[in-house]
Amino acid sequence: TQYTIISAVYNVEKYLDDYFKSIINQRLDFKKNIFIILVDDGSTDNSAQIIKTYQKKYPKNIIYLYKENGGQASARNLGLKYMQENDYQTPWVTFTDPDDFLDRNYFYEVDQFLATHKDNNICMIGCNIILYHEKQKLYKDNHPLNFKFKNDIQVKENCNLDNFIQLSAASCFINIRYLNKLLFDERLKPNFEDAKFINEYLLENINLKSAFLPKAKYFYRKREDGSSTLDDRDKTKDYYITVLNLGYLKLFKDTKTTVPSFAQNVVLYDIFWQIKTLISNPEKLAILNDKEKYLFKELLFKNFNFIDSRNIKNFNLNAFDFFYKKGILSYFKNEDLSENIAFIESIDDKNDEILVKYYFNDIDHKIKILLDDKVAAIKHSKIRQYDLLDKVFLYEKRIWLKLKNDTKILDIFVNSQKLKLVFNNNFINDLNEILKVLNKQKKQRLKNSDLWLFADMSWRADDNAEHLYRYVMHNHPKQKIAFILSKNSIDYSRLKKEGFKLIEPKGFYFKYLIYKADKIISSHIDRYIFNALGGDTLKTKDFIFLQHGVIKDDLSRWLNQRKIDIFITSTKAEYNSIIGDFNQYKFSTKEVVLTGLARWDALIKNNILNTKQILIMPTWREYLSGKVQKYGARARNPEFVKSLYFQKWQEFLCSKELEKLAVQYGYSIVFIPHPQIRIYLEDFNLSSYIITSYKGSIQELFCRSSLMITDYSSVAFEMAILNKPVLYYQFDKDEFFVRHSYTKGYFDYNKDGFGRVFADSSDLFLYLNKKINHLQDIVINNMQYQINDTCKSIVAKIR
């Protein structure tokens, strides 16, 4: 059999050699059986020259076409039209993407299958997508739909495809004989043009069959730079509006009969990824205005009108688990699953407690928990809320229960319905497996020594861990302690002289101490610590999160990923924002304590009044930072200097108004941006009167300063503790809360902040010039905080 490949090409010069070699070197004879039509969709790189080089070698097999840029669908359509106009006699066509590549047996497997299935009723062949992670050079057979290929070759009637859905045109073969005049929808961007095309084709040929071949392997490249088609699709309005309207809804409306299960499942699969993303990253929808958000929600509900509840319940996809099935049924269908499940999420071997969670949508439900037929002792509980758009998607009840050694049976009833129990993805009838794991963890914990390991950043100290270490060193001299810090740190010699036991954050000895430590106490949550010995590094250790500052925004998305045993907070509002019900955090009164920050003891003690120093301390932007390197530091981002952040702060720092404050009023100006920004200091090209190098403690800066200017940084709380004024310069508020690593929380800068908020630097300077001689008059401080003996309080909680 002969085959045609149509490939849409756009700026893929660095991938074309892999693409061509994988096709030319096929086990099935390339020259006799495989023809390639490459449609250059207006590439601006060297793609055309590379294609023409291969075309010279194989003029009968390779066709090159050029068109102005119009998108993948228009390029593929040009290829299909070229086939028709030139009367191609190849019965099968596929749409291999030119940044991907094929297994050597790819065409051979398809050809062998067709040779043994000549009954002419196969209209589509689906092939096995293997993900190739370019950065790690890793092949992973973990595509969400790979269950289709876990057994031998599968042949299914199109009317009964059900879960065997096909969304990729690149990894399937279409029989030209049945294609008629069907083309890709050129209006559909950034995705679903493949899925719509294939499934319109299957609906047109509902009485034919499709085959799925496990050994025909298609290697999908996950690009190192994150520029694969699927990586950026959620950054466009079309993903939320056009795809739902012209993609999903059009597919449903064009179906001439009842929408078959496979077509429902295609849309359910694609729409699920949208829902999943928006529950965990609601800020992604900020690209839509209010009218567009309303339209998006309306389109979601219209699409779900075509999707049967039965398909939602039965959909076979690992990621589409109980949580999403229950939530989607509740949200879109106002229905519930017939069964309910409680999940045992975590085991605390130290306190003989287990964390049980279950999902619900009725706040007024009644719960009864029995351990061996006796009412269980609930140690801590929490209601976590999941939202989708402007409505609750689902609630999660989190309960810590105390176990006894001989506890055998756990029964949980919600509104008299008994919940099934799941542990490690398996249903369980009793607690035997739980107790085995509990005892195994206890044995592992016995291997810990009485060592406390402290860390701020691997390359910087001068934060809460340093201050708490110093307190323990002086007040609990018998306690075994060590401090993790690179020898290259500017703090290394200072702490060494003071008697700190310093440990290099790499090598065998570092890992050995992580293995032996009973408590790891850090102001940051860095991968080099929590992943030092693999994913279970902290399982049988206490991780004490001292924090880098006071949480004022919603950090739940980041912090919920981590195991934290003691979570330090400093203000009543911060504490309540984390442990309270109906928020996004997983943490409860079990982990979260109100003590104040360790560094505050020294801060208050060393405060200096009547100084003339302005401290400028903007925070960082995750989206402007380079890639994370080893030990938490980040590489330079060459695009940083083009950013609004850089331009606005450079304009501010180089302004005549700032210089006037220094010269006319005799103020020192100190610019100390976030540590992740300091690598760009030279780019700001600042005047000599601005101090940027500071080798002392960061605390001294707060104590010696009379005013702070920041944007969103929680260091403003340090000035509030000292009852000193703060001004906020926020020129990018909308962008910041959409693109940074957290979303807006309980803290309103205008109501709760410690000074005026300005979007324009000229307004800030105008205000400051009026108030410069009476700075104490502009102090705003309504905070309820914990500031007495903070180190002592923290150690008491740790012990």
Language-model features: where?
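Short, well-formed alpha-helical segments that are part of the catalytic scaffolds
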Residues: 12-26
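A conserved acidic beta->alpha catalytic loop
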Residues: 40-49, 71
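Glycine-rich, basic loop-to-helix element that forms the pyrophosphate-binding segment
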Residues: 67-88
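Conserved donor NDP-sugar-binding/catalytic core segment of glycosyltransferases
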Residues: 101, 105-144
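Conserved nucleotide-sugar donor-binding catalytic segment
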Residues: 155-243
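Conserved catalytic-core segment of nucleotide-activated headgroup transferases in glycan assembly
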Residues: 258, 462-476, 598-683, 758
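Active-site and donor-binding regions of nucleotide-sugar-utilizing enzymes
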Residues: 442-445, 449-603, 623
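Catalytic binding pocket for nucleotide-activated donors in carbohydrate/polymer assembly enzymes
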Residues: 588-589, 682-687, 712-783
